Design a protein with these regions (language model features):
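Aromatic (often tryptophan-rich) hydrophobic motifs at membrane interfaces
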Residues: 183-286
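Active-site/acyl-donor-binding loops of N-acyltransferases
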Residues: 2-55, 96-115, 243-328
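Well-ordered, non-membrane alpha-helical segments in soluble/globular domains
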Residues: 71-80, 168-173, 230
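STAS-typified acidic loop motif
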Residues: 52-53, 58-70
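Extended catalytic core of nucleotide-activated donor transferases of GT-like folds
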Residues: 71-96
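Hydrophobic beta-strand segments of well-ordered beta-sheets in folded domains
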Residues: 60-65, 84-91, 243-245
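Residue-level marker for well-ordered alpha-helical positions
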Residues: 77, 120-123, 230, 256
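A conserved beta-strand-loop-helix scaffold within acyl/acetyltransferase catalytic domains
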Residues: 2-57, 91-100, 104-221, 234-236
Length: 328
């Protein structure tokens, strides 16, 4: 099979080799998750340090913890205090010790990774894509123009809209923020000058996080996403400075096809509970059987509505979540 890795490094720069800092200085200044936190902050997200970890705001005025792979066992009183002080609607974090929604993180730790590591249905798709595309890092101007086109194509296909990727000015801010962070990279698939798919990845310490992936509808018959996933995963798998590749959380809405896609590329779904705490005032109103029933009925009437499915999952998570053992 022809090589698909046309560049020595598609994955961005490691933050572990900052020449200007000694190991002692880095130990004092580094906080787990701060690389992704800086990228998010430059994009306009609020970053908070509380409960011994970093948090960032997501649409809906919720807080989520960083880094994604760190399992938390928090004091519920401290979580509620953080939510009140930041005026957030709620917080969500992964835990092995709290109860909550059944969830998980897609992770790959293999060192030996090649075309044979893929599910048999994916192998011919990757081979076909190799004949049609090349893999290289996207340049800023390509992302500003063609990347935005891919965002619109992907969101239209999925029946959703995220202003950060759809609004031209907010997308420009996203790209500028990324290029201010050397750990953020944009591996992409091209047919000549035409971009067919891209990823946004973040390299922090010994983890590579695949943050976003977009593609052009017209190119899907030639499987650009399959080639991109394979190329990035293969390069990360053989990188001895990396411990693991993270392909994101299990989403709060139904996404069976996405789950199967990731597993077929050799990723494992490492289970955990997604713990959700609402603002105490909201909890009194929303964490009620009647409210959950109303949302459940709305989901049945409007099938495949990701916003309603997410709201239903959040309310169910709030009902289920709580510490099962005393916090450390």
């Amino acid at each position: 099979m022809p090589s698909v890795l046309l560049e020595p490094n598609l994955l961005g720069q490691s933050n572990s080799g900052v020449a200007a800092q000694s190991m002692e200085e880095r130990a004092r200044t580094h906080v787990p998750g701060n690389v992704l936190a800086r990228f998010l902050e430059l994009r306009g997200r609020q970053i908070i340090k509380a409960c011994g970890t970093l948090w960032y705001t997501v649409p809906g005025r919720f807080l989520m913890s960083l880094p994604y792979q760190t399992m938390l066992n928090l004091d519920p009183d401290e979580v509620r205090r953080m939510i009140r002080e930041t005026r957030a609607f709620g917080a969500r974090f992964p835990s092995l010790s709290w109860t909550g929604l059944e969830s998980g993180l897609y992770v790959l730790r293999h060192r030996d990774y090649d075309i044979g590591s893929l599910h048999t249905k994916h192998r011919p798709r990757v081979r076909r894509a190799v004949q049609c595309f090349e893999v290289r890092t996207a340049e800023k101007v390509e992302l500003l123009n063609q990347g935005w086109e891919l965002n619109l194509s992907t969101m239209a296909r999925q029946g959703r809209y995220d202003a950060e990727f759809g609004d031209r000015h907010r997308w420009e801010r996203f790209v500028e923020a990324a290029f201010a962070c050397p750990e953020i990279a944009f591996p992409a698939v091209f047919s000549g000058p035409r971009m067919a798919a891209y990823m946004a990845t973040c390299r922090e310490e010994k983890w590579l996080h695949i943050l976003h992936q977009m593609s052009r509808q017209e190119d899907l018959p030639n499987f650009p996403n399959h080639l991109l996933t394979y190329a990035v995963t293969k390069q990360a798998a053989v990188d001895t400075s990396l411990e693991a590749v993270c392909y994101g959380y299990v989403p709060l809405f139904a996404a069976d096809g996405l789950h199967e896609y990731k597993l077929r590329f050799g990723y494992e779904m490492i289970p955990h509970h997604s713990a959700i705490q609402l603002h105490p005032s909201l909890n009194l109103v929303l964490n009620q059987p009647a409210t959950r029933l109303a949302v459940r009925i709305a989901c049945r009437l409007q099938k495949h509505n990701q916003h309603l499915e997410t709201l239903q999952a959040v309310l169910e998570g709030a009902r289920l979540s709580g510490p099962s053992i005393n916090p450390c």
